[in-house]
Amino acid sequence: MSGRGKQGGKARAKAKSRSSRAGLQFPVGRVHRLLRKGNYAERVGAGAPVYLAAVLEYLTAEILELAGNAARDNKKTRIIPRHLQLAIRNDEELNKLLGRVTIAQGGVLPNIQAVLLPKKTESHHKAKGK
């Protein structure tokens, strides 16, 4: 017989995405496509999109974690751009990474210069009282 037909052949395994193989939520296939189409290099290795997707996922998780904490501190259950701004600007490393980034509707960090604050005069009151 000519080896055709289904009798004896192995069943094809269920397709498994590269994201699930790498244990990631971010799409490795899409990142690979964007790297190829973006004219960053003539060729793109198999590990590059996995690594880049992992880095993007980590940064996103880090920012969302801090933004969720900022939302909880403000007694809110929904993250808004203000919470993202507070999360990024209060974290030294993220602030350095995203220093030139403007977040729409993010506002600014509350900051009052020390010289503008009212002076403490308690020591003078005690001295005059004696």
UniProtKB/Swiss-Prot annotation:
Modified residues (N6-crotonyllysine): 37, 119-120, 126
Principal place of residence: nucleus
Modified-residue entries (N6-lactoyllysine), positions: 10
Pfam families assigned: Histone, Histone_H2A_C
Record-listed N-acetylserine modification sites: 2
Modified residues (Phosphoserine): 2
Gene Ontology biological process terms from the UniProt entry: heterochromatin formation; negative regulation of cell population proliferation
List of residues that carry Phosphothreonine: 121
GO CC, alphabetical: extracellular exosome; nucleoplasm; nucleosome; nucleus
Record-listed N6-(beta-hydroxybutyryl)lysine modification sites: 10, 14, 37, 96, 119
Gene Ontology molecular function terms on file: DNA binding; protein heterodimerization activity; structural constituent of chromatin
Subcellular location: Nucleus; Chromosome
The UniProt record lists the keyword Phosphoprotein: yes
Signal peptide: none
Comp. bias regions, Basic residues: 7-19
Stretches for region Disordered: 1-22
Modified residues (N6-(2-hydroxyisobutyryl)lysine): 6, 10, 37, 75-76, 96, 119
Task performed by this protein: Core component of nucleosome. Nucleosomes wrap and compact DNA into chromatin, limiting DNA accessibility to the cellular machineries which require DNA as a template. Histones thereby play a central role in transcription regulation, DNA repair, DNA replication and chromosomal stability. DNA accessibility is regulated via a complex set of post-translational modifications of histones, also called histone code, and nucleosome remodeling.
Similarity remark: Belongs to the histone H2A family.
Subunit structure and binding partners: The nucleosome is a histone octamer containing two molecules each of H2A, H2B, H3 and H4 assembled in one H3-H4 heterotetramer and two H2A-H2B heterodimers. The octamer wraps approximately 147 bp of DNA.
Protein name: Histone H2A type 1-C
